[in-house]
Amino acid sequence: MASIMMNKSVVLSKECAKPLATPKVTLNKRGFATTIATKNREMMVWQPFNNKMFETFSFLPPLTDEQISKQVDYILTNSWTPCLEFAASDQAYAGNENCIRMGPVASTYQDNRYWTMWKLPMFGCTDGSQVLSEIQACTKAFPDAYIRLVCFDANRQVQISGFLVHRPPSATDYRLPADRQV
């Protein structure tokens, strides 16, 4: 057995000993060096302006109703309690103006910002269509607000997940995935 392992390690080391190919470097119009990687948009700079993110899935394009429905089904399958929250555009992101600070330490809630709860948490909800109808009602009542769906685990007494289900049409702080890099 030891000799077989020894032979494999020798073979691996011979394969790894091959010299790496150096990338072809060319100069672009401005005189900067470019490689194949930069031409393929693999080495890009993150756009720091108007590119704010929220919780889970915020790096993706806005979720469709079907995708939200699948997430709701997953939440209900795991016996978690869904809850809708909404916030105005100026209160949606964490900041000194809208965070509750308790002395030198922050509160223990997720990211120190509290959104307004839409009705009560949906305790005992077993049908995903109920959650989707509440999302539609909240969107109709507050069309220019951010709306997120969070879910809580009653056994562990923690928030399990949270993601946006509605971004206001007037939001200018979001970029499509193709525009997030320079």
Swiss-Prot record:
Transit sequence range: 1-42
InterPro entries: RuBisCO_ssu, RuBisCO_ssu_dom, RuBisCO_ssu_sf
Keyword list, A-Z: Calvin cycle, Carbon dioxide fixation, Chloroplast, Lyase, Monooxygenase, Oxidoreductase, Photorespiration, Photosynthesis, Plastid, Transit peptide
Gene3D superfamilies, sorted: Ribulose bisphosphate carboxylase, small subunit (3.30.190.10)
Record carries keyword Mitochondrion: no
PANTHER family: RIBULOSE BISPHOSPHATE CARBOXYLASE SMALL CHAIN 1, CHLOROPLASTIC, RIBULOSE BISPHOSPHATE CARBOXYLASE SMALL SUBUNIT, CHLOROPLASTIC 1
Name of this protein: Ribulose bisphosphate carboxylase small subunit, chloroplastic 1
Originating gene: RBCS1
